[in-house]
Amino acid sequence: MNQIRQAPAASASNATESKQEIRNYTMNFGPQHPAAHGVLRLILEMDGETVVRADPHIGLLHRGTEKLAESKPFNQSIGYMDRLDYVSMMCNEHAYVRAIETLIGIQAPERAQYIRTMFDEITRILNHLMWLGSNALDLGAMAVMLYAFREREELMDVYEAISGARMHAAYYRPGGVYRDLPDTMPKYKQSRWHKGKALKRLNAAREGSMLDFLEHFTDTFPQRIDEYETLLTDNRIWKQRTVGVGVIEPDVAKAWGMTGVMLRGSGIAWDLRKKQPYAKYDAVDFDIPLGTCGDCYDRYLCRVAEMRESNRIIKQCVQWLKVNPGQVMVENFKVAPPKRESMKDDMEALIHHFKLFSEGYCVPAGETYSAVEAPKGEFGCYLISDGANKPFRVHLRAPGFAHLSSMDAVVRGYMLADVVAMIGTYDLVFGEVDR
């Protein structure tokens, strides 16, 4: 596929002789390519099938989220956080509400902290299942997507039961969470797809509360992960496509500011849940999976192992929440809305609710940086308040932006087919990259 052009004849005597010059050619990868994972436009300079240079172009999903958050009261921007990395919704909310809580000087009740920890890990599993299915599909393994979405659907039902939305939950609030865990789970209804014994089997775990459902999920999920690994871990085609591809040395990972699996896959044990614990991560037991070679295969193994660790954390949170009832919102009426029951017969409570959600509340002047260990890496929120009811400045630290910056250094020298594997291993979502 090299571009070949014929050089002009040097003189009349050798006019019949021709000289060929081989030069590199340029290829546009995306933004319409199905493996671009959104709107990535990657301009590749190719020498045959080998990548000489990669130039990622971003901005096609830029929506001005930071400026939007600066134009609204603090408590009205939580919904914007869901729409950044729209596969890791509640983790984004967590960073933002923690920043507000730090400036106000409040702390969520212990039960709310456990609920946040549990839903952070549910979100991590949701993200990794999406990554596992889509990355395998990019490399030609279609069945894995069908397996992964089987469990993902169950956890999406948990999102819907707690917030009413399958994706953009807006469940975390400064001072706690929107509401306590429900006593019932939504059930499948009889249809042409669900009927008879299959319907009873699907609803068997949904007879009790959400905690009962999650307890059943944590008991069965390890076997489901074993099924994913049966399909991929020792699959020779999968290993040929990922082993030794996209190797990132530890010093390179640190130099580019990588976090999350991109860093731990290279053997560096940096995890904010362990190094700078927040919520209730210091009260639960879990390990940090590490890679040894820093290639795509190691990062795959790390993400699969992380799902097992997230399952352990969820199980511990469920056990604690079952025996420890309590408040899920601070009793600080500056940030906490009145109870719904009181608004039915108390005009003052109704006015309080209206003003809280229409005008918000003033946050003391100051600045803070709050970060969480999101599924893709360190997601941070740098927040500046000037004492008004709106932020003076909101800056969001998206892990995908730092990772994408290293694309040129990582993909050079690899084949064109390997670029798909490397884009997949980055686990990019352009809602957070472009913001």
UniProtKB/Swiss-Prot annotation:
The keyword Protein transport does not apply. Signal peptide: none annotated. GO terms for molecular function: NAD binding; NADH:ubiquinone reductase (non-electrogenic) activity; quinone binding. It holds the Pfam family Complex1_49kDa. GO terms for cellular component: plasma membrane. Keywords: Cell inner membrane, Cell membrane, Membrane, NAD, Quinone, Translocase, Transport, Ubiquinone. Its EC number is 7.1.1.-. It is a peripheral membrane protein. It is found in: Cell inner membrane. The keyword Cell membrane applies. It catalyses: a quinone + NADH + 5 H(+)(in) = a quinol + NAD(+) + 4 H(+)(out). It is an enzyme of class 7 (translocase). Belongs to the complex I 49 kDa subunit family. NDH-1 shuttles electrons from NADH, via FMN and iron-sulfur (Fe-S) centers, to quinones in the respiratory chain. The immediate electron acceptor for the enzyme in this species is believed to be ubiquinone. Couples the redox reaction to proton translocation (for every two electrons transferred, four hydrogen ions are translocated across the cytoplasmic membrane), and thus conserves the redox energy in a proton gradient. HAMAP family: NDH1_NuoD. NDH-1 is composed of 14 different subunits. Subunits NuoB, C, D, E, F, and G constitute the peripheral sector of the complex. This is NADH-quinone oxidoreductase subunit D. The lineage of its organism: Bacteria, Pseudomonadati, Pseudomonadota, Gammaproteobacteria, Lysobacterales. The gene is nuoD.
